[in-house]
Amino acid sequence: MSDNMEFPTKRMRRLRKSPQIRNILRETRLHPSDLIYPMFVSEKLGRGDVEAIDTMPGQFRYSVDDAVSEASRLEDEGLSSVLIFGMPSAKDELASAAHDPHGVVQRTVRRLKEETDLVVMTDVCLCQYTSHGHCGIVVDGEIVNDETLEVLSRIALSHAEAGADVVAPSDMMDGRVAAIRRSLDDAGFQDTLIMSYAVKYASAFYAPFRGAVSSAPAFGDRRSYQMDPANIDEALIEAELDLREGADILMVKPALAYLDVIGKVRERFSVPLAAYNVSGEYSMLKAAIKSGYLTDEAIYESILSIKRAGADLIISHFAPDLLGVI
């Protein structure tokens, strides 16, 4: 190291001496366009019937009307994107309601595209729609992969037909991106993007979400299709496979406990990268803030760390909290 890189010649505190200097030298910045807000829309609710989610303070289940109103309000505050999760009034073993053209997600998407300029993304999965709560078709107690692909393709196509800009398969079945891309292209939806939950771990941090949408599995767990939290090389293989199959955007989920994975995926692939700041990460921060152990500044810092790790887009329940801050 040369002499001019040593103290007292080199003084790093010069770079931090005022808010103005710190601001112009800041390496990582959050912008409202970085944020995607996940919204829960229930077919069982009517206009004005907004349900608080006990496991996720400050989050709600909305009717179609109220979801559109809330999304429009947040758009006025700077939000650019939403990710829609549906909750049907009836479930069955084959997730039939998930690809109903008049289903809750499909109706919400149509309204959002008519009444807002938001980028509308949709979650493509079976778990909220199956009576058993698994993300795939079950045959003799086994989650079967290839039979599930046809259902996923039908769901994604129904979302595209409703006007979704981006479909986001979250099931973790092998080959789902290729199947969905083929289905969309064959139907003339070549311009519909796929944001793949490429690297989705079998995480304990999903627990509040499963309570929010009543999607906990009725038997077993999801470890036969979601990834082992111990693995990182596998994450790179999953990401590459999804890119080869036609994914436009990759996603890592969860985010905060997997910042190293986000960094590795960012380093390897020069494609748009999303990260999901999941329900457990949200709820534990909310609980700590409510108890006085942390301040609201921890929200900004945690989301900033996801951006710094390499994510271009951040799906977060904190989006409304951040719109007035960043």
From Swiss-Prot:
EC top class named in words: lyase
Domain of life: Archaea
InterPro entries: ALAD (IPR001731), ALAD_AS (IPR030656), Aldolase_TIM (IPR013785)
Repressor keyword on record: no
Subunit structure: Homooctamer.
Name this protein carries in UniProt: Delta-aminolevulinic acid dehydratase
Catalytic activity annotation: 2 5-aminolevulinate = porphobilinogen + 2 H2O + H(+)
Sites where the protein binds Zn(2+): C125, C127, C135
Its biological purpose: Catalyzes an early step in the biosynthesis of tetrapyrroles. Binds two molecules of 5-aminolevulinate per subunit, each at a distinct site, and catalyzes their condensation to form porphobilinogen.
Residues at which 5-aminolevulinate 2 binds: S279
Gene3D superfamilies in the cross-refs: Aldolase class I (3.20.20.70)
Cofactors that this protein relies on: Zn(2+)
Organism: Methanothermobacter thermautotrophicus (strain ATCC 29096 / DSM 1053 / JCM 10044 / NBRC 100330 / Delta H)
Pathway: Porphyrin-containing compound metabolism; protoporphyrin-IX biosynthesis; coproporphyrinogen-III from 5-aminolevulinate: step 1/4
Sequence positions that bind 5-aminolevulinate 1: R210, R222
UniProt-listed GO biological process terms: protoporphyrinogen IX biosynthetic process
E.C. numbers: 4.2.1.24
